[in-house]
From Swiss-Prot:
Produces ATP from ADP in the presence of a proton gradient across the membrane. The alpha chain is a regulatory subunit. It is found in: Cell inner membrane. It comes from Vibrio vulnificus (strain CMCP6). Gene3D superfamilies: 2.40.30.20, ATP synthase alpha/beta chain, C-terminal domain, P-loop containing nucleotide triphosphate hydrolases. The record marks S373 as: Required for activity. This is ATP synthase subunit alpha. It is a peripheral membrane protein. Its EC number is 7.1.2.2. ATP binds at G169, D170, R171, Q172, T173, G174, K175, T176. HAMAP family: ATP_synth_alpha_bact (MF_01346). F-type ATPases have 2 components, CF(1) - the catalytic core - and CF(0) - the membrane proton channel. CF(1) has five subunits: alpha(3), beta(3), gamma(1), delta(1), epsilon(1). CF(0) has three main subunits: a(1), b(2) and c(9-12). The alpha and beta chains form an alternating ring which encloses part of the gamma chain. CF(1) is attached to CF(0) by a central stalk formed by the gamma and epsilon chains, while a peripheral stalk is formed by the delta and b chains. Keywords: ATP synthesis, ATP-binding, Cell inner membrane, Cell membrane, CF(1), Hydrogen ion transport, Ion transport, Membrane, Nucleotide-binding, Translocase, Transport. One of its GO terms (cellular component) is proton-transporting ATP synthase complex. Belongs to the ATPase alpha/beta chains family.
Amino acid sequence: MQLNSTEISDLIKQRIESFNVVSEARNEGTIVSVSDGIIRIHGLADVMQGEMIELPGGRYALALNLERDSVGAVVMGPYADLKEGMKVTGTGRILEVPVGPELLGRVVNTLGEPIDGKGPIEAKLTSPVEVIAPGVIDRQSVDQPVQTGYKSVDSMIPIGRGQRELIIGDRQTGKTAMAIDAIINQKNSGIFSIYVAIGQKASTIANVVRKLEEHGALKNTIVVVASASESAALQYLAPYAGCAMGEYFRDRGEDALIVYDDLSKQAVAYRQISLLLKRPPGREAFPGDVFYLHSRLLERAARVNAEYVERFTNGEVKGKTGSLTALPIIETQAGDVSAFVPTNVISITDGQIFLQTELFNAGVRPAVDPGISVSRVGGSAQTKIIKKLSGGIRTALAAYRELAAFAQFSSDLDEATKRQLNHGQKVTELMKQKQYAPMSVFDQALTIFAAERGYLSDIELSKVLDFEAALLSYARGQYAELAAEIDKTGAYNDEIEAQLKKLTDDFKATQTW
């Protein structure tokens, strides 16, 4: 068989044309140094701030410092086996976490991976952890309540859907207990909850999850965990990951509540990362952008209007507003609310609930200090009946605190002052509440009605809580229809007032407490 030169050249051309050349361009760099969870990378030319960098073994680092000839990145996870000279790759992606209803009832880590042993999570969507907050035009004013189930909070410091209300106090003053009770109270309210645990002991978090499960609230809750044993990077990112999960509900016309427990530990984790990245320290060694750290997180909690929801869902959801309510927690040192991080978060949020060690130790639990606790926007969101009845509660407590200080130095008090002191003591006693026992709107309204209309004046101080328990039990038995109506509508009119008066008079006549 003979081949001439033309056939040979045609054959070669065919082979060349059919040859499949596959080339892959990868943005690759080399690790120059590894120390304390921070890696320096040389050669990553095209990398974004906050980009995920793929490391050997399927782990990732987060690019935070972009310098002229190197990139400073923080490793998300263990770093002991990383060595100088290893190759790393830029992914071109910002960190994303899984979001959606599939996460409800689950315990996940910062990256959205399940850690509760209940199998994988089949989430259909992911969302970037860093998202720009809704603009002014997309927002709507707060006018719907979030019932915490606490008499002292719902009457004096009401919280609305889309509000940011800070819970602040020293260690062991009941901050987490208050937030967990607020989550438990949402189990039948249609509000989804996200609990973000930052830098806490694993045993404490396990206890919280168990309590949520016991009270039937875990099925509507996502628990995001960055425990004390996790790296600083994961503790710093956990609130943003939890917020992205909450925004899924907000942007689809649902209501969600997120608890950050606590942002002091997140600020400490961020300070650690910043100092290791050699960023210049400022006040209390925090970096210059620690205010922005919290403001960009808390601004994402908002009430968005129906147009925003409709636009976001491409017209699938119409006529529904969405909200994300935030309860950030800050731990103070020896009651110092004027420290750097507490003052920052106080100025960002729409009010604060201040829990005091002295009150807690005196048995007033929840230990809410009504003097410096405020809610800047919750008043317009308060349930109508609670708003009408609770007007005098804060005044009575403030007057009582002031008079109690003078009463220590004086024995001969006039009748009016004695009456005021007596009333203040009774109201203080009445504001006490057990943990894991959130109260309905009707129960709160009836209790406050009894206090405000003078029904407690002849009750001994030690019997006030017994009187309240017996009154509520009697009301639920004899006036079930009234209770159901108030729980459903929260309305208040002359007819309801007359019924509440008759109920309390009838009960007092029984003398059974």
